[in-house]
């Protein structure tokens, strides 16, 4: 016989009274599924994530049907068990959206017999057991091994609403399954009995148990009725059947005797809300401030068994319904968070019970019936005598179904009360003993009755009838009225808040409310008292206030309280409460003690000191604080107030001292922005739409997104507004002078900075009265955080001194960096950019930071500083201190306590510029302190190619030099192991009259770094690590006689002419004029630069304008003209009829080999055929270059080792008697030709790519093998690029049989002005034939002008680099310079500052990061700073190199002969580091080949340097 399940309240509720009373477990009852549409049963969620199992018994005759199902509510994971294929069980499941795994049992189970089914989950495996006969398993191929389960366990079918919502089902096909028809019983999860939660269209089928021992409440043998008659409710207490006849109108053990005297309570039966027969109901409405009070003082209660019954209807979650007793003898019945709470104490400790409904809460505005019974029972005690003891059995039931039974403690069994019976509330509910709530009831109470063996108190009736012992407080309506609900509100922004009236809680008080949020931080409640001043002989005057606060920090809830004797800070709950669920908070205090409870967990506290009075004089703020906080005093302990963390989330059911507060109405009255009268949690995550712009970091908040803009350079809710930039030049600052002194224990600081200096103050808090500071600064390229709390002044337990943290590295790179500081009491965290945070813990007990100012750029409050940090040069942006963006607040005028002279906007910073007017000007400063490490920074601007910028000598050989050489920066130093040189990397010479930034550093591991603008060069040196400097530091130059004694690697022969600025010497910013020990020459503040600058028409006839510091000069070399502005005629010769010839011969030891040539000449003639200029190589080599006229057109032929190459201007007829200028350039096999202003003719021979690769390869081929290799390449058809051993320049073409007749002017060839030399009777010039000089040598060719011209050539000509076979005449008397080869971190050999070269195969002189010439690159990609560039050769070039090696092997005998033949010639030696495959010899500008020594670390090699191998040139 089955009992149908009952529907109630719109939900399908199983009639689980029998189940919860033990029938499911003890009677062996099963669930009968009729196979009807809409049938379903839901069991509690089975967490089948990892390792778990569930089992049940099944009986059916059906071949198809859904047995069970659960999933993750529409995402990926599910498990389904169905009957299919002739009554066999089929199991399917999936994890992480993988292909579902399926297994089909072999044994049919639709035979009408009971079968045991067990499902075992083990990560990706699931096993199905049927009886003991079959076990099969299957594995899902999933990337994740854990299953996610959100839904309940559905058995027999799915609820209709779930079938209708396809998106909530992971497996859509489950909606189409037939419902199961049959019986299921004994559902277990992990061996524990599982009870159904709810269901529909399912019957509870009673079957006799398999074994004896029925329940005491079972029906009799005849099956008629039960133990309790007339509708009595049976419950089992101590294994005995107990009948509740109170609602039947009968009495007796089995409710069989009619009771004519006792009012029946049948109307309280489940589902029967009608009136009892002909009897009046006693109902009262309570609205939060009303209550009944029955005086028991005349007739005290003394009983061991009693009963309380009542009915209630409410929408509120919390409220006192009934209380009697005091101290340790009481009964308390209340509604707590929508559940019914019972607390009983008979003197030996409280018995607490909480009854919660299966679905929803009891505050559903429906009638619910409560019954509490207490009976004296014998209970077996375990002790020495094993005796039976008397205990009180307590049972509470709600709606006759939900029952909780327990025992009071020890031997106390009597309830005694001579106090009052409170109904619906009390004068101070929070102070009642054992009260779990602090507010009164709001709703309707009906038929409140207390009875025991001696007395029956119908409290509702007594109140209505006006019994003299019953007092009614407030206006009570004796009917059920709708009580206005306390609607929840939502604080949508951190700035929103509500002001509540002052809370008068001097001695006692209580506050309760519910909240829910997902945000980690927020001030929920705050109020403080009148400020009072405390004075002490040892302490300065301090302001103290009483205060009360409840706040959230990092997801935890804290209570803060100070009554004048010290602050307490209590964490109300160990778990975080920002999970989006509702939490009920109840705060109660009585004097110095009290409790704070969250949901059911209560935390007691006792305030320190003697004060018991909480004197709050200000309003009580809910959700946050007003923007204008001038009248508020923030205790340092309330971190959220000082951090400006307002609460964002929902609040409801606020009760203060038991009185409800309609906060929705208050918000409307106050017109509070950002407060919404409802509470809902949006399912969509706001950050999914990427609302944060400009790479802001998004965090999901409560129905909102929160953007972290600190690392973006933008501000605003969505990082949409560009933050203001402040520029600092070392003399600038911004100072925030706060209106009142601040005291904080927690700070959030963030800022962005950009600087090229390794030192400088970023931000600091300063105090006028103490050494307290929180300071951020750059220190050796790192961010340094200093927190100093002045313990001496306030006589606290002194700490070990300032706490410091360091983060970041090489932050002086002129890039934006973000710094974040978080301090919470003693805890420190420092983060730079996205690097790992550095954390620290402060020592001592003192955590309060005092400050009057927030300063940037310069610290002005210096009274308590032992050392003043260096001033800042750079840019600051987005400075935010505790939520205040001060830079933008200052700019916008939002605050009036801001003082600054830093400049708004991003500006190029040139700090304290100084001009060195002449090359003999310099200053001397105090010795540079760079013993263990060094950070130098300066800016310079010049037009000079060379000059000494910085020099400091020291003990022994120690020194440091920074200089310009040919427009490139050199850093030279000696730490004691020999001099080293690092050449700075730059794309072009730096003497371009533009500002350049230079950073030079050395760390403790001897890593040297040179950074010029954005290009970086690094080198590690071995050996000594200390730079021991002693003498003065010279800036701009030294005394004239000192240049001769400078170290050999120093090229400077004169000082620096130009501007220096932003000089930073290891964090010291010297004033180059004021701080100078002495000055020499003309030095002025500021930097005006040249008074005359290059213009488009500064130089005539296509002359090149060269900017000089005191003006400009013109490079006329390729114009054929002369003079300061290239508008004077060049040296001119007339070649008359019969012809003539001017011949220049290089000395035998000075014959250059060139990769690039430049030739220019002016002429006029009427000849159709003639040779103007011819350059020939040494006899037997066959290389030449010839400029000629053919059929009236100009052309050039040249040969550099293989075929003749010709280039001609075919469009211009030049034998017209007019003056023409021809310009020719060659680079390898490529050539250009231009006549006058005609377009440039270009010629690129085929196979040029191979030529470039050959040029790379030839750099690694010794000169002695060059000719052999060239011959081998000639056979292979390769085009060479070197014009070898140039011997003569022949002008006039007489020897070639095509003599020139006409005028030739201003001949220029690779730096030689041959016609000028002829006019000056140069010894290497021979003139024959009819040749006549026109006029005089141009006046511009003075010695000074020539030097200027040659300087111009060096600075602009990159294709006329030459190499001679021996030292030039000008340097012949001086030993060759010896320069070290130093290893950098990237295996770059740092050699000469000039062009590194092979002695034949020469590259144009271009700077590289290590001092080596970079091979020509294809494309525009720059090498990574500080690294050597790698050139990958093609397979054809690889084969070529193999051939080169083979050819070299065949030439050994030839080399031996060559060494003997040329042993008396001047030598140019070089050293190759075989392990690095880099060539390290360097060419001087005058053509000298420099001898070099081994690396300085190889001391033995230095000692034997005279025994090095020598190579000779063929």
UniProtKB/Swiss-Prot annotation:
Residues 1481-1507 are annotated as: Interaction with CASK. Residues 1460-1514 are cytoplasmic. GO terms for cellular component: cell projection; cell surface; endoplasmic reticulum; GABA-ergic synapse; glutamatergic synapse; neuronal cell body; nuclear membrane; plasma membrane. Residues 31-217, 283-480, 487-679, 725-898, 912-1087, 1133-1331 form the Laminin G-like domain. Disruption phenotype: No visible phenotype, but mice display subtle behavorial deficits. Females show deficits in nest building and taking care of pups. Mice lacking the alpha-type isoforms of NRXN1, NRXN2 and NRXN3 are born at the expected Mendelian rate, but die during the first day after birth, probably due to neurological defects in the brainstem that impair normal breathing. These mice express normal levels of the beta-type isoforms of NRXN1, NRXN2 and NRXN3. Mice show reduced density of synapses in the brainstem, especially a reduction in the numbers of GABA-releasing synapses. One of its GO terms (molecular function) is calcium ion binding. O-glycosylated; contains heparan sulfate. Heparan sulfate attachment is required for synapse development by mediating interactions with neuroligins and LRRTM2. This is Neurexin-1.
